[in-house]
Swiss-Prot record:
Residues 73-94 are annotated as: Disordered. The modification Phosphoserine is found at S84, S88. It holds the Pfam family zf-SAP30. The modification Phosphothreonine is found at T91, T93. One of its GO terms (cellular component) is histone deacetylase complex. It comes from the Eukaryota. One of its GO terms (molecular function) is transcription coregulator activity. One of its GO terms (biological process) is regulation of DNA-templated transcription. A zinc finger (Atypical) spans 20-68. This is Histone deacetylase complex subunit SAP30 homolog. It is found in: Nucleus. Keywords: DNA-binding, Metal-binding, Nucleus, Phosphoprotein, Repressor, Transcription, Transcription regulation, Zinc, Zinc-finger. Component of the class 1 Sin3A-histone deacetylase (HDAC1/Rpd3) complex (HDAC). Appears to be a non-essential subunit of this complex which is not required for cell cycle regulation of progression through the G2 phase of the cell cycle.
Length: 173
């Protein structure tokens, strides 16, 4: 399962003869169906985002084409990032790029949660945990000028604490 879409790797049926099961703006899509399925969860997302997509009741399957899969995923990721930025107290969020925490494993997210003592409820799914951690991550204050100044200083001096720990900066020549 990838972002709510079934990848179909566990499905042995072929999709070469099937077309997308969606009706896009009152017209049935004629693209070849891929391995992504139009699940109840995806239907809910489509309804919330007010996309003009619906499943064709005459379709014998729930597989959708890659075009619609990408369209649904792009709306989902845009919304997630927009919500996260709205919750932030920063005035200029366009200048900041944030890591994609949604790609991290659950154990890594839990380790972050433990380290920063982020309060969450028990049994959260990975996406919910990533949302909570992203909101916390954006609240961590950083002093960009100080960090850049320190970085330039370290480069000019030719020293880096991380390189020395790993044995990289210890040249004996």
């Amino acid at each position: 399962m990838n972002n709510g879409f079934s990848t179909g790797e566990e499905d042995s049926r072929g999709h070469a003869d099937q077309t997308c099961c969606l009706i896009d703006d009152m017209e049935r899509c004629r693209n070849q169906a891929g391995y992504a399925s139009y699940s109840k969860r995806i239907q809910k997302t489509v309804a919330q985002k007010r996309l003009r997509l619906s499943s064709d009741p005459s379709a014998q399957h729930i597989y959708i084409c890659d075009h619609h899969k990408e369209r649904i995923q792009s709306v989902r990721t845009k919304r997630r990032r927009k919500d996260s930025e709205d919750d932030s107290n920063e005035t200029d969020t366009d200048l900041h790029e944030f890591p994609d925490l949604y790609q991290l494993s659950v154990s890594t997210l839990r380790r972050y949660k433990r380290h920063f003592k982020v309060q969450t409820r028990q049994g959260m799914k990975r996406a919910q945990l990533a949302d909570t951690i992203m909101k916390h991550f954006k609240t961590i204050p950083i002093k960009e000028k100080e960090i850049i100044t320190f970085f330039v200083y370290m480069v000019k001096m030719g020293t880096n604490k991380l390189d020395q720990k790993n044995g990289i900066g210890n040249d004996t020549t």
